[in-house]
Regions:
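C-terminal domain-tail junction helix/linker
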Residues: 186-188, 209-288
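RNase H-like two-metal-ion nuclease catalytic core shared by retroviral integrases
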Residues: 32, 168-183, 190-212, 223-232, ...
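Residue-level signal for the short linker/turn that defines the boundary of a DNA-recognition helix
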Residues: 9-11, 51, 66, 222
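Basic, flexible linker segments flanking DNA-binding modules
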Residues: 2-4, 20-106, 197-198, 251-261, ...
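Helical coiled-coil/dimerization "stalks"
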Residues: 1-19
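Mobile genetic element proteins and their domesticated derivatives, centered on retroelements
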Residues: 15-16, 26, 41, 56, ...
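Mobile-element integrase/transposase regions
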Residues: 65-128, 134, 147-155, 159-164, ...
């Protein structure tokens, strides 16, 4: 159509009449190839089956600069709309859990709850390093909207470094748009366990069991301030005074410090070897 308009200098109406096609068809412009977007959207939908197009758009906008209208259109064309059922859980296969070899490869999150003597309910938000078993944060508050969750995580990152991934359940605080956008910004992989499968976050479940058995069930909290004080004291004892059988009966803090010392020593040895190799290579090149 455009070629005819340019070649014969005719009007759009005249050309459409001669070709017997509607003017709307004459104005049609083919869309860009969406195959790359479709493939990535299918992949993201498999990884996050309970995410709608708005949350999936956060990934695609970050990776490809795609606007939300295009994501919505392609999402609907692919038939990826999330079903609104609550009785059945959509199960998905998790990747086999990798063997952890260093701190900050994976953190684990979960919540516990209790009540003060005055009847005020509160929640406890815990953060663990799955390798060192250290409790990195144990925050007490009456509620944990997603912005408070990310604030706690950023303080933990400032103290311990950034994790590669975070394992958690599918609670609303941990699947919100804000939390997802925060993880994308920080380049942290989110590992959401399957609904009804708490054993997929076994380390955190074990920690929560100890927290309840040794602190929440045995302490009388007069108010939130008292709860924060007693739970913080329990966290210190858990990290620095209690040996762990899987850590050769070292405390979690001892294990983390010894790992860091060994890692630093190994790095220095490798640097020394590299300098020696560079010196030998340089000497060999100077020989006649």
């Amino acid at each position: 159509m455009r070629r005819l308009l340019e070649e014969f200098k005719a009007s759009e109406r005249h050309v459409c009449e001669l070709m017997a096609v509607p003017r709307s068809s004459g104005r049609y412009r083919s869309r860009r190839d969406d195959r790359r977007i479709e493939e990535r959207l299918r992949e993201l939908a498999r990884e996050h089956p309970r995410f709608g197009y708005r949350r999936l758009h956060l990934y695609l906008h970050k990776e490809m600069g795609v606007n939300h209208k295009k994501v919505q259109r392609v999402y609907r064309e692919l038939g990826l709309s999330v079903k609104r059922t609550r009785r059945k859980h959509l199960r998905r296969a998790l990747q086999p859990r990798a063997v952890l070899t260093a701190p900050n490869q994976e953190w684990a999150l979960d919540f516990a709850s209790d009540v003060t003597a005055a009847g005020q309910r509160f929640r406890v938000f815990g953060v663990l390093d799955s390798f060192t078993r250290q409790c990195l944060a144990l925050e007490v508050a009456t509620s944990f909207p997603s912005r408070r969750v990310t604030s706690v995580l950023e303080r933990a990152i400032a103290a311990y470094g950034k994790p590669q991934s975070i394992r958690s359940d599918n609670g609303p605080e941990l699947t919100s748009r804000h939390y997802l956008a925060w993880a994308i910004e920080w380049k942290i992989d989110l590992l959401h366990i399957q609904p009804g499968k708490p054993t997929q976050n076994g380390g955190m479940e074990s920690f929560n069991g100890k927290l309840r058995d040794e602190c929440l069930n045995t302490s009388w909290f007069w108010n939130l301030f008292d709860a924060r004080k007693k739970i913080s004291a329990w966290k210190t004892e858990y990290n620095s005074r209690r040996p762990h059988s899987s850590l050769a009966y070292r405390t979690r803090d001892e294990f983390a410090l010894q790992w860091q010392a060994a890692s630093l020593s190994e790095a220095k040895s490798m640097a020394r070897i590299s300098r020696v190799k560079a010196t030998l290579t340089g000497s060999a090149s100077l020989r006649p």
